[in-house]
């Protein structure tokens, strides 16, 4: 908190974990919100995601706020899609909230009829997004090509663009620097397994909104694919075997014709299988293989379909050591 107070400028965006997460670490999003809010100096300039109602509360009653967000996107929905809706009630007055559109989960265009909390007009806006093509446009002018074709990544890039722009960097320079940016922390890794190509997406198990975006990345691939989900450890820091967060994840996203096989692996494979038994995914697509090496061997075949691996920081090395990292 002292470190935050020393900062005159602060960026709070959609990836700051103001979502449901592991109880042993983050408690509840509103608890985290209050802890951060109390640490913000009154003169701090905030850079906020206007599409997240809880994050937007940081700017409630403040003038020194720069807002970023997404405009109307082709993937928007009129109804909420997911397991739970953290945007159902206003984070400010707790009254029922209305949405004109959802980008994903509770991120979208919202308004509270009671207290007036609503999505603010944005200075930096994703005005178009073609995830299949892998391209977004900011403020109808700056085009950025995507390496990771997910809305979650779009918001990260938009936040980075906003911060760089308000600090004086030319927009064209920012767009060029961000285009085809590859994460250096191995959150997303491409690999080869025999004759098959694949992508490992590191997803925090307990953050269901992040996890949903990883599932959607696989499900929306226009090519056929197999999906390997590994839950071998729950936390790197805390000793816990709590897997209740599995029930917050929208595994129905894998009910897609392009997803041919789903392999569940790791210590908690049977917990995964139980969760999948309550999903709409075809049971015939699901195979449970506890041993990770055996799961890799099962996928090492002559098929040409791409492989998506979805796992956490603790478990990704257990898979990557068995394949050729590109």
Region spans (language model):
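Short beta->alpha connector loops
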Residues: 6, 52-53, 204-207
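ATP-dependent carboxylate-amine ligase
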Residues: 87, 94, 104-119, 162-169, ...
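Acidic, Mg2+-coordinating active-site environments of NTP-dependent enzymes
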Residues: 15-194
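Generic recognition of short, well-ordered alpha-helical segments
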Residues: 7, 27, 158, 210-213
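Short, structured coil segments at secondary-structure junctions
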Residues: 7, 42, 61-63, 279-282
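Short glycine-/acidic-enriched loop or helix-start segments at secondary-structure transitions
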Residues: 5, 24-25, 56-59, 77, ...
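Single conserved hydrophobic/aromatic residue that forms the stacking wall/gate
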Residues: 1-12
């Amino acid at each position: 908190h002292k470190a935050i107070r020393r900062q005159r400028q602060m960026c709070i965006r959609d990836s700051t974990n103001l979502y449901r997460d592991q109880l042993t670490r983050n408690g509840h999003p509103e608890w985290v919100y209050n802890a951060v809010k109390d640490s913000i100096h009154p003169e701090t300039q905030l850079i906020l995601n206007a599409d997240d109602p809880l994050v937007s509360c940081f700017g409630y009653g403040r003038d020194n706020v720069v807002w970023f967000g997404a405009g109307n996107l082709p993937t928007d929905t009129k109804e909420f899609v997911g397991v739970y809706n953290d945007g159902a009630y206003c984070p400010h007055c707790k009254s029922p909230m209305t949405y004109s559109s959802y980008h994903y989960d509770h991120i979208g265009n919202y308004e509270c009829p009671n207290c007036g909390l609503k999505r603010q007009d944005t200075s930096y806006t994703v005005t178009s997004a073609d995830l299949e093509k892998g391209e977004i446009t900011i403020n109808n002018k700056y085009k950025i090509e995507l390496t990771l074709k997910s809305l979650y990544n779009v918001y990260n890039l938009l936040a980075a663009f906003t911060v760089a722009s308000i600090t004086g960097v030319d927009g064209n320079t920012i767009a060029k620097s961000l285009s085809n940016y590859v994460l250096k922390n191995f959150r997303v890794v491409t690999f080869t397994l025999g004759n098959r190509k694949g992508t490992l997406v590191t997803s925090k198990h307990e953050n269901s909104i992040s996890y949903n975006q990883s599932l959607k990345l696989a499900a929306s691939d226009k090519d056929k694919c197999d999906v390997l989900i590994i839950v071998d450890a729950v936390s790197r820091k805390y000793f816990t075997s709590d897997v209740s967060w599995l029930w917050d994840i929208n595994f129905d996203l894998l009910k897609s014709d392009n997803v041919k096989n789903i392999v569940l692996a790791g210590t908690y494979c049977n917990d995964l299988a139980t969760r999948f038994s309550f999903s709409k995914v075809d049971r015939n697509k699901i195979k449970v293989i506890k041993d990770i090496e055996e799961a890799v061997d099962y996928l090492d075949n002559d098929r040409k379909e791409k492989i998506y691996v979805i796992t956490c920081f603790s478990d990704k090395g257990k898979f990557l050591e068995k394949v050729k990292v590109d």
